[in-house]
Amino acid sequence: DPKFAFKLGFWHEKISPIPDFEQSYLWYSVSVSSGVYKAMKLRDRVGKEIEVEKIDELQNEAKEIITKNKYFNQQNTEENI
């Protein structure tokens, strides 16, 4: 769920006792790719705290999450038909 991904990003950035900007960036990226564009500004803000090389890894990880999520959503839809 894109809104849940947004909430995870926010939690890792602002609520967690130990902020984790990498996890925040990851979940904001998933959220943006799923259509929650207000997460873009937040993702870019936490991205300033992360090394460029790590951002590339996180973007690839976000793509994997999105791809797997689309696969499972498609499987669930086909099973319900």
Please identify what each model-predicted range represents.
Residues 2-5, 37-40:
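Helix-start (N-cap) detector for alpha-helical repeat units in TPR-like alpha-solenoids
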Residues 39-81:
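Terminal, low-structured helical/coil segments at or just beyond the last alpha-helical repeat
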Residues 30-33, 67:
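Conserved structural position within tetratricopeptide repeats
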Residues 14-19, 33, 48, 52-55:
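Short coil/turn and helix-start
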Residues 5-14, 44-48:
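Hydrophobic face of amphipathic alpha-helices that form TPR/SEL1-like repeat modules
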